[in-house]
C-alpha cells in the first residue's frame, strides 16, 4: 500500500489521537530553555521536564511529528550525509509519549497495531529487539502480541562496556531517568546484504530499525544504583523518512517522494543529468535543515548554532559548484521544499522570503570567501620549500574560509604539490573532539530542585495576597525553617508575584509574617511552582507559616507599561518592515524594554521614526487592553502571534489591543494603551546575523529621554554658535591683518593733485569693515590727503571715502562718495572726514573711480 510522506505523518498522528493522545505541534529546532542541546534532535526534547517530573501538563498522552537536526555537537551526521541511504542533517521523528500513564504493554500493542493494521506491513517482515534482561517486554511481544520467539532478539551490554551500556538501554544523562527499550526492525529482503541485529553483519542494510520504544522505569543515581520510578513513562521515536521508504517500496530514504522532488529540482537548476549523483543528495538534504533552521530563527554566524548552519550551507554550495552550478542556486530550492513538505511546512511558507534572502546572501558571501581562500592558498604554496602543504594550513582554509580539503588538494595537485592529509585529519579530529565534549550532557538531573507543590498565580488582579508557605530551600536543599540572613527560595501555595516568563522579569516585594520579613528580590518558575528568591531580613520563617505576599506595586506598574509597549512595537515593526519580522527575544524591566527581532538589514532612521509614530498613535487611541482565555487552536484562528521559543498550555491568554495587536501572552499588562503615555526608541542595532535589537522607554522615562535629547541638541547648537562666533572673530582678525598689509601696498599708488595727496583704488574681496580700517590706516600713513576706495562683493559695490581734517573745508567725504555712488546705481553720504555708500552696477565701478581725480581737482 503506497502512502506519501504527508499521508504517513497524518496517519500516525490520527492513529494516536484515536488512542487518547494529544496532538502537540513540533517544537522549534532551537531547544527551549535547554542549554544541554545544540538543536532539537528527538521528539522527547520538548517533554524533558515532563519526564523529569518538573512539569505537569493537562494531558498524560501526547503524539508529535517533531522536526529534528543532527549536525554538530554530540549528534553529528554531517560527514555521512549524501553517502549513505539513511543519514540526514534534518529529519522528522514521529513519536508517542506517556507521562506516567500507559506503559510497556500498551506501547507495544499500539506500535504493532499501527504497523500491521494501519500501514498493513507484513508481520513476517518485522522483528524486534529487547534488552537482555527485560523479560517483561519479551513476554508481551511473544505472548500478548504473538511475535514468534525466534523473531525477538535479546541485546545485552556492549563488549568491554559498562553495565547498561547497550543499544537497548536508554539514558538521559549520567544520572536521572533511564530504562530498557525495544526496537522494531523491517526486513528489506534477502537480496540486500546484512544480518539480524546482534550479529556481526548487523551494519548491513537488510534489517533497518524503524521504531524505538523507550521505557523509562528507573532513576539512576550517581553511585550507579537503579531506583524504580513511581510512575514509569514511555518515549518512542520513528523516523518518517525510513517508514515512508517502506511504504513507497524503495530502499533508500533519498528515493522517497520528498527527496525525489528536491533532487529533480536541484538537477534542473544546476544542469545535472545524472540523478544518482551523490552531490544532489547532499543538496536535497541540506536545503531541509538550512531552511527550517532559519525559519526557527537561526542565522549564519561564526559560533554556536549559526556556525553549524553556515557549515551546512557552504557544504551544499560546494556540492553545487562540483555539479557546475552557475551563480547562486541554493535559495531557489526553498519554494520546492515548502511544497514537498506539505502540512509540515506551514511555518516555513510564512518565512519563505526571509529564508531565501538569508541563503542567497550567505551563498554570495561564500563566493567572496572562496576568492580570499584561493589567495591565501596560492600564497602558502608559493612560500613552500618542499612539495607538501601542511595539514594545519589545509585545516585553516577549511575551518576559517570554508575551503573544502578536496578543493585544496585539487589546486595543489595542479601546481605539482601534495597536501598533508594525515595532519589535516588530525586537526579535524581535534575539532570533532571539542564538539563532542561541548555536546555532552554531563548533567546531574537529581541536583535540580524538585518541587511537588504547585503554586497558583493570582497576580493578574491583585498585588497582595495571604498565602501559606509550602516549601523552603537554601542552596538547593529543602529546609523546614529560615533564620535571619538566610538567602533562600520560598514556595507559596498561591502568590501575586509574577515569575519571569516571556521576557518579563520577575516581581520583587516582601513576604510578611508576624515574626519575620522576607525580601523578595526575584521571582522565577520552578516546575509548576513559583519560586520567590530573596533573603530573610528579620525574624524566622517556617514551612506552613502564613504570610502576606506584597508585590512592589510601583515597579510592577512600570513593568506592565513596558510589556504592553513591546506588543505595540512588535506589531508596528511588522507593519513597517514586513511580515517576516518575528520576535527573537525580549527583556521587559521597570526601567526600559529590549526587543530582539528578525530582520536582515539595519532599520533606517525613517523606518524607526515611522515605528515610533505608529506606537504613539495607538497609545493616543487609548485602546482597552483585553484578555481572553481560549484554546490554542481558537487563538491561532484569531491570528494571535506566539512568542519565539515559548511553550503554551492547551488554554492560552490572548491579549488584544484594538485591531492593532493580538498575541499570546501570560504577562502583566496595562489596562489601556493610553496608560503607557509615551514611547521613545533609544537605540537600534544588530546583535547577530539577521537579528536586530531595539531598546526603548515609556512614560516618564520617555519624557526624560526626549528632554535629554533636546538638551543635547541645545548644547550642540550652543557649541556651534560659540564656534561660529570664534570663527567670525578669527576671520575679522585675518581681514584686519590683510587690510593692514593691503594699505601698506596702496601707499605706493598715492599721487598729488594741486599739491594734495590723493589715493583712488579698487579692492576686490574686502568687506566694508575692512575698507574702513584701511582708510583709517592710510590716513595715518599719509598725514594729509584724500582717499577713495571701492570694492565688489557678491555683485554689489561697496564705496568708502576718507578726508583728513585739514582738507574737509575744500573736499567733503560725503559729497565725494555720493558722486561716485550715483555712477554705480546707488547713493550714500556721511561725515566730512569719513563716508560710505553702495551700488548695484559693478561694471560701472572702474569708470566711476576714474572720475574722482577730476572731481577733486575742481575743488582744490
Swiss-Prot record:
<dbReference type="InterPro" id="IPR009000">
    <property type="entry name" value="Transl_B-barrel_sf"/>
</dbReference>
<keyword id="KW-0067">ATP-binding</keyword>
<dbReference type="InterPro" id="IPR045864">
    <property type="entry name" value="aa-tRNA-synth_II/BPL/LPL"/>
</dbReference>
<comment type="function">
    <text>Catalyzes the attachment of alanine to tRNA(Ala) in a two-step reaction: alanine is first activated by ATP to form Ala-AMP and then transferred to the acceptor end of tRNA(Ala). Also edits incorrectly charged Ser-tRNA(Ala) and Gly-tRNA(Ala) via its editing domain.</text>
</comment>
<dbReference type="GO" id="GO:0004813">
    <property type="term" value="F:alanine-tRNA ligase activity"/>
</dbReference>
<dbReference type="GO" id="GO:0000049">
    <property type="term" value="F:tRNA binding"/>
</dbReference>
<protein>
    <recommendedName>
        <fullName>Alanine--tRNA ligase</fullName>
        <ecNumber>6.1.1.7</ecNumber>
    </recommendedName>
</protein>
<keyword id="KW-0694">RNA-binding</keyword>
<keyword id="KW-0436">Ligase</keyword>
<keyword id="KW-0479">Metal-binding</keyword>
<dbReference type="InterPro" id="IPR018164">
    <property type="entry name" value="Ala-tRNA-synth_IIc_N"/>
</dbReference>
<keyword id="KW-0547">Nucleotide-binding</keyword>
<feature type="binding site">
    <location>
        <position position="669"/>
    </location>
    <ligand>
        <name>Zn(2+)</name>
    </ligand>
</feature>
<dbReference type="Pfam" id="PF07973">
    <property type="entry name" value="tRNA_SAD"/>
</dbReference>
<dbReference type="GO" id="GO:0005829">
    <property type="term" value="C:cytosol"/>
</dbReference>
<dbReference type="InterPro" id="IPR023033">
    <property type="entry name" value="Ala_tRNA_ligase_euk/bac"/>
</dbReference>
<keyword id="KW-0030">Aminoacyl-tRNA synthetase</keyword>
<dbReference type="Pfam" id="PF01411">
    <property type="entry name" value="tRNA-synt_2c"/>
</dbReference>
<dbReference type="GO" id="GO:0006419">
    <property type="term" value="P:alanyl-tRNA aminoacylation"/>
</dbReference>
<dbReference type="InterPro" id="IPR012947">
    <property type="entry name" value="tRNA_SAD"/>
</dbReference>
<dbReference type="GO" id="GO:0008270">
    <property type="term" value="F:zinc ion binding"/>
</dbReference>
<dbReference type="GO" id="GO:0045892">
    <property type="term" value="P:negative regulation of DNA-templated transcription"/>
</dbReference>
<dbReference type="InterPro" id="IPR002318">
    <property type="entry name" value="Ala-tRNA-lgiase_IIc"/>
</dbReference>
<feature type="binding site">
    <location>
        <position position="563"/>
    </location>
    <ligand>
        <name>Zn(2+)</name>
    </ligand>
</feature>
<dbReference type="InterPro" id="IPR050058">
    <property type="entry name" value="Ala-tRNA_ligase"/>
</dbReference>
<feature type="binding site">
    <location>
        <position position="567"/>
    </location>
    <ligand>
        <name>Zn(2+)</name>
    </ligand>
</feature>
<comment type="similarity">
    <text>Belongs to the class-II aminoacyl-tRNA synthetase family.</text>
</comment>
<dbReference type="Pfam" id="PF02272">
    <property type="entry name" value="DHHA1"/>
</dbReference>
<keyword id="KW-0862">Zinc</keyword>
<dbReference type="InterPro" id="IPR018163">
    <property type="entry name" value="Thr/Ala-tRNA-synth_IIc_edit"/>
</dbReference>
<keyword id="KW-0820">tRNA-binding</keyword>
<keyword id="KW-0963">Cytoplasm</keyword>
<dbReference type="GO" id="GO:0002161">
    <property type="term" value="F:aminoacyl-tRNA deacylase activity"/>
</dbReference>
<feature type="binding site">
    <location>
        <position position="665"/>
    </location>
    <ligand>
        <name>Zn(2+)</name>
    </ligand>
</feature>
<feature type="region of interest" description="Disordered">
    <location>
        <begin position="824"/>
        <end position="843"/>
    </location>
</feature>
<dbReference type="InterPro" id="IPR018162">
    <property type="entry name" value="Ala-tRNA-ligase_IIc_anticod-bd"/>
</dbReference>
<dbReference type="GO" id="GO:0005524">
    <property type="term" value="F:ATP binding"/>
</dbReference>
<dbReference type="InterPro" id="IPR003156">
    <property type="entry name" value="DHHA1_dom"/>
</dbReference>
<dbReference type="InterPro" id="IPR018165">
    <property type="entry name" value="Ala-tRNA-synth_IIc_core"/>
</dbReference>
<keyword id="KW-0648">Protein biosynthesis</keyword>
